[in-house]
């Protein structure tokens, strides 16, 4: 899960991931404190989601991180509603919006479209959690509490 972004099938695959990764990490570092934590969280969460729900195939490359960063940066601007994240969201969408949509379409078996999707889900969840930590806690809290027995059960 953690080493997947470091493994690539070819030099072309490495270059195809490296260029957007440099741009997206630059945008992340310029707009967020502790950007390295966000990147690691996307790698781990996206990798876990892919491990649970992904196809039985070899998933290589930094696509989980790339797609996670795209969605994180775009939705971060939407959720946070602050000037810098909004500008970063617009720049990210202009640069990578088309790639984002096309990346979810399974075109060949060599492309991990499900890795793209899992990275995007991780990025979206982290963007929401960062902007609304209390709301996420409120939504998850009922799932962790034991429910009292229903009253009037005749006992």
What are these regions (language model features)?
Residues 149-155:
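Long, low-complexity, intrinsically disordered segments
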Residues 1-149:
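A detector for small-residue-rich transmembrane helices and their helix-helix packing motifs
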């Amino acid at each position: 899960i953690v080493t997947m972004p470091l493994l690539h099938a070819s030099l072309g695959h490495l270059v195809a991931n490296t260029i957007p990764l440099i741009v997206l990490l630059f945008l992340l570092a310029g707009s967020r404190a502790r950007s390295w934590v966000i990147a690691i969280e996307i790698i781990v969460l996206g990798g876990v989601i892919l491990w649970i729900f992904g196809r039985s195939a070899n998933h290589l490359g930094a696509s989980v991180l790339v797609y996670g960063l795209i969605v994180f940066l775009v939705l971060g601007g939407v959720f946070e509603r602050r000037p810098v994240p909004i500008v970063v969201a617009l720049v990210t969408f202009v640069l990578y919006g088309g790639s984002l949509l096309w990346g979810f379409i399974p075109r060949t078996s060599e492309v991990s479209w499900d890795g793209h999707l899992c990275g995007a889900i991780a990025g979206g969840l982290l963007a929401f959690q960062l902007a609304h930590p209390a709301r996420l806690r409120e939504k998850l809290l009922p799932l962790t509490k034991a429910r009292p027995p229903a009253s009037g059960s005749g006992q």
